[in-house]
C-alpha cells in the first residue's frame, strides 16, 4: 500500500507504474496523483471508472450494466477478455438469484451524517444496488448519487427497512445507537424493530464488489424476523 488515501504524484512515480486505475476523477486532481495528461506524457496509461468519469452525469441512473462495462473494458486492456466475460456471467447469475429472494419493501439507504442524513438518491450506486435487489428506494426523487435530507422527511416517509453503511469512520453500530436515541426516529417501526441491513462501505461504491452489496441487501431483507415488512 502506497498511502492510506491518495498517494502523491512523487510517491506513485517511485512505484514506476505502467497503468493507473482510479474509481473517482478526484484521484487525478491536485490532492491526488496529478493530471492524467501528465501521466500520458510519461507513457503511463490511466483509467477512471465510468461511474466516476467526469464525462458522465449522475442525473442519468447508474446501472449494473455500467459496472459490467468497466469489467469488460479493464479485461480488454489487460488482454483477459475471456476472464472478464466469465466474471460478468457469474455476477449476473448471482444478482438474479439474490433478486429472487428479496421482498419489495421501501428502503432508506443511510450513508452517513447525523444533522442532515446523506441517503441513496436517484442515480448512483446505492439506487443501482436497490434496483438490482428488487426493492424500492425511499429517496429516489433526490438528484445525484447521494442526497442530503432531513430527519423530519425520513419520519414522514417511514422506510420499512434501513440500510446502514458500515465504514471505519462511521460504523453501523454507531448509527444504530443514534437512531435508538433520537427523540422521533426511535418510534419508527424500522428502528423499534431494528429492521436494518448492514452493508460494508466497500460494496457501496460502483465497482466489482457491488454484487456483494446486492446479495447482502436481498439476503438481509429475507432474513428479517417474523413481523417484518413483506
Annotated model-derived regions:
Residues 9-22, 151-167:
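Proline-aspartate-enriched helix->loop->beta-strand connector
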Residues 10-14, 33, 37, 65-72, ...:
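Solvent-exposed, polar/charged alpha-helical surfaces in well-ordered, non-transmembrane soluble domains
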Residues 26-34, 44-73, 104-127, 172-173:
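Extracytoplasmic ligand-binding site segments that recognize negatively charged/polar headgroups
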Residues 77-133:
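Basic- and aromatic-lined ligand-binding clefts that recognize polyanionic substrates
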Residues 61-70, 161-230:
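Structured C-terminal subdomain patch of bacterial secreted/periplasmic proteins
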Residues 2, 23-27, 56-61, 72-82, ...:
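Second-shell loop/turn segments in exported
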Residues 4, 22, 49, 140, ...:
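Short beta-strand and adjacent tight-turn residues that come in two discontinuous sequence segments
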Residues 1-28, 138:
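A short, structured surface patch at a secondary-structure boundary
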